Amino acid sequence: MIIIGEKINGSIPSVAEAIANRDAEFIKQRALAQANSGASYIDCCASVPEAEEVETLKWMIDCIQEVTDLPISVDSPSADVLTEAYKFCRKPGIFNSVSGEGDKIDKIFPLMAQPENKGWQVIALLSDDTGIPKSAEDRLKVFDKIMAKAKEYGISPDRIHIDPLVEMLCTSEDGIAMNVEVISSVRKQYPMIHITAAISNISFNLPVRKLINFGFVVLAMNAGLDSAIMDPTNRDMLGLVYATEALLGLD
């Protein structure tokens, strides 16, 4: 399982405060804790106004790289920000993210196609200009368009992490059945592709979130999930991931 550490994100109040105060030690401690807990990548999201985002991401990336040499998932909703911020990374990481929305793919995929950026990967969300499709069929249509673009630019499937966009269980009509269908279909079509998800989204606004997250991880991994945006310092969750890999013969 590819673990993308989620704990350096400006949408978290304590991280937002550290960013505002330029508290480098706080960012470094979070990066080091995730690195020591088994993260594969450290996600770095500023969640500040776009005019401040590139400079803020530079500061955050510099802090992270002072304490770990793990690759970074550079996280921004703006493709323009990503095309600048990735330059601050010392080694190839992940562009987080593109989607079927607007021209994001046409800004990021050409960068990834450049010889000097061959090691970079990307998270691709199954949404488009209409928003998040409601059915598995429509999400898979977005997926097909993304993969057509990947072929056009010469981006191999093993450099792509497809995010089927897990939504809150409390607003879902069919639990996670649709997500499982999407994950299974993507995995069957492209055995070498990566499939990721923000694990904690599923349990938002629900009691006993931990148990719901656990159940989702097992079902999603069985369907083909091999990447996760999660808290690697959560030993119970990480242990569950390793146990599920063993049970599926993936360890």
Feature-to-residue mapping (PLM):
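Alpha-helix-loop-beta-strand connector modules within alpha/beta enzyme cores
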Residues: 6, 52-90, 176-197
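A structural motif
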Residues: 38-39, 69, 90, 120, ...
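Glycine-rich, proline-tolerant flexible connector loops at the mouths of alpha/beta enzymes
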Residues: 35-70, 164-176
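Active-site mouth loops of central-metabolism enzymes
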Residues: 3-29, 96-103, 129-137, 202-210
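Catalytic alpha/beta core domains of metabolic enzymes, predominantly
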Residues: 106, 116-251
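Active-site-proximal loop/turn and secondary-structure-junction residues that shape catalytic pockets
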Residues: 8-10, 46-50, 78-80, 99-101, ...
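Catalytic beta/alpha-barrel core
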Residues: 43-50, 70-78, 93-104, 126, ...
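Conserved, mostly hydrophobic/aromatic
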Residues: 34, 75, 85, 162, ...
